[in-house]
């Protein structure tokens, strides 16, 4: 099995002030980030410029939390891929469960956003996940695969585009609840997603695509989760706003060394 480069992303969501973002990003950037790990943080849109200015590390990338599915135009309140690129951003989170569940974003809309970003050369952190009711109904894989099928419909089997996709499995019932999926539960889904990729996209590529876990991941549980062979890192919410985020970076680097 080829070694997949570990990936950890910090999703700041709708949190922080200008002063906090400046100091927090500067603190992460000043930390000795292992060169073996890809590290990104995603502040809100209004904090992007502050985060970019505070980032002094070549090992830390700044990401956007969302993007619109069209280019520049009459889309009040939206942000285009072109605008993100103009700021020098290389990464964007797409399809987060809060976008899907609260904002009503559909599988098709998430997929179209991802295609536009990928076509322009960005790396997409593409989120999938099931609700508690869907898990109880034994529809976990069906729901997650449907979200990936929508992406496949947009980008096909293009190796060039899929190479810039990081899949983030985030069980909705675990996000912000403090209820984390067990390593066994998370690994089972990651195995299923990798199997789908091997069968529907590319068998060889399935061994290379990174699938990370998101859902109340923190400094206390990331080591056991990271020991699972198919979990390649984390998309971190609340813990990314705390000093423990750098601890998680180190733990991931050592666990996946």
Swiss-Prot record:
Sorted alphabetically, the Gene Ontology BP terms of this entry are: gluconeogenesis; glyceraldehyde-3-phosphate biosynthetic process; glycerol catabolic process; glycolytic process
- EC number per UniProt: 5.3.1.1
- Give the residues the record marks as binding substrate: 11, 13
Catalyzed reactions = D-glyceraldehyde 3-phosphate = dihydroxyacetone phosphate
By its UniProt entry, which Pfam families does this protein fall under?
TIM (PF00121)
Query: Which pathway does it serve?
Result: Carbohydrate biosynthesis; gluconeogenesis; Carbohydrate degradation; glycolysis; D-glyceraldehyde 3-phosphate from glycerone phosphate: step 1/1
Q: What class of enzyme is it?
A: isomerase
Question: Does the record carry Isomerase as a key word?
Answer: yes
Q: Which terms does the record give in the GO molecular function aspect?
A: triose-phosphate isomerase activity
Give the record's keywords alphabetically.
Gluconeogenesis, Glycolysis, Isomerase
**Active site (catalytic residues):** 96 (electrophile), 170 (proton acceptor)
GO cellular component labels: cytosol
* Record-linked NCBIfam families: tim
The annotated subunit structure for this chain is: Homodimer.
Q: Which family does it belong to?
A: Belongs to the triosephosphate isomerase family.
Name of protein: Triosephosphate isomerase
């Amino acid at each position: 099995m080829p070694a997949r480069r570990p990936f950890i992303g910090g999703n700041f969501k709708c949190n922080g002030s200008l002063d906090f973002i400046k100091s927090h990003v500067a603190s992460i950037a000043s930390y000795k980030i292992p060169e073996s790990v890809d590290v990104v943080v995603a502040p809100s849109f209004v904090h992007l410029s502050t985060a970019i200015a505070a980032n002094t590390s070549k090992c830390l990338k700044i990401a956007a939390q969302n993007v619109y599915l069209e280019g520049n135009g009459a889309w009040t309140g939206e942000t285009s891929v072109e605008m993100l690129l103009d700021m020098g951003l290389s990464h964007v989170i797409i399809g987060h469960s809060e976008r899907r569940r609260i904002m009503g974003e559909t599988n098709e809309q998430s997929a179209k956003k991802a295609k536009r970003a990928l076509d322009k050369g960005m790396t997409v952190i593409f989120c999938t996940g099931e609700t508690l009711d869907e898990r109880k109904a034994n529809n976990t894989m069906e729901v997650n695969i449907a979200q990936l099928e929508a992406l496949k419909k947009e980008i096909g089997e293009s190796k060039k585009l899929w190479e810039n996709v990081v899949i983030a499995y985030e069980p909705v019932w675990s996000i912000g609840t403090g209820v984390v999926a067990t390593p066994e539960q998370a690994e089972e889904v990651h195995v299923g997603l990798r199997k789908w990729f091997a069968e529907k996209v590319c068998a060889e590529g399935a061994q290379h695509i990174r699938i990370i876990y998101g859902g109340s991941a923190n400094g206390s549980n990331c080591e056991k989760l990271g020991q699972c062979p198919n979990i390649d890192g984390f998309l971190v919410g609340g813990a990314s706003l705390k000093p423990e985020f750098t601890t998680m970076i180190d733990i991931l680097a050592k666990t996946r060394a």
